[in-house]
Amino acid sequence: MSNSDRSATGFSYNTRLNILHGPLETIDVAGLVEACTDRWYNQTLCKVDESVVRLGVVHGEYHWHKHDNEDEFFYVVSGQLLIDLEGRTIDLTPGKAIVVPKGVRHRPRAPERTVVLMVERAGIVPTGT
């Protein structure tokens, strides 16, 4: 399943909820990143118990949103990810991570091409509310 919405700046979000890999399958994250041509790409890589691991290759800004029932974990592999919250901005660079708690309005944005791994509950709607 793919969901392609548009950002505030006019480019499409490419959100893929299909799970690419099962247990004991090697995941070529670098290959997926290299092949990505989208400005905002979000692919579910695998399921771990009741959570999923997603790969984000992003450049630009996402819309303001929140997840009412799920926390969201972001880990920056390369680039820079800014997480805007109401009242402050968190700056994540390679090797840095954060958990955005459920119910907190936030807006991820990347001033340059950025690679992010995200962990969240399998049923989460990535676009939020």
Task: Say what each PLM segment does.
Residues K102-T129:
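Ligand-binding loop in jelly-roll beta-barrel domains
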Residues D49, V77-S78, T93-P94, E112:
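A cytosolic small-molecule/anion-sensing beta-strand core signal
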